[in-house]
Amino acid sequence: MELALQITLVVTSILVVLLVLLHRAKGGGLSTLFGGGVQSSLSGSTVVEKNLDRLTLFVTGIWLVSIIGVALLTKYR
């Protein structure tokens, strides 16, 4: 059980990083520091962006549950 949670944690950690990097910069914050503040002529959210947001939230939820699971298993081992 602990091994499965640890594998899930590693996989979801990598997925969260990749999914966050796939998002377009929305301006402001630290993204403008690295040139992410340039806006394209297409403003607004597309279906792809909305689905990417949903997928990111879903994977982040799994990541959070696996972190709590690993912490509880470590504490009560």
UniProtKB/Swiss-Prot annotation:
Compartments, as annotated in UniProt: Cell membrane
Organism: Mycobacterium leprae (strain TN)
Protein's gene: secG
Keywords per UniProt: Cell membrane, Membrane, Protein transport, Translocation, Transmembrane, Transmembrane helix, Transport
Role description: Involved in protein export. Participates in an early event of protein translocation.
Main subcellular location of this protein, as a coarse class: membrane
Family designation: Belongs to the SecG family.
Protein name from the UniProt record: Probable protein-export membrane protein SecG
Membrane topology field: Multi-pass membrane protein
Transmembrane regions listed in the UniProt entry: 3-23, 55-75
InterPro entries: SecG
Signal peptide: none
Molecular function per GO: protein-transporting ATPase activity
One GO location term (cellular component): plasma membrane
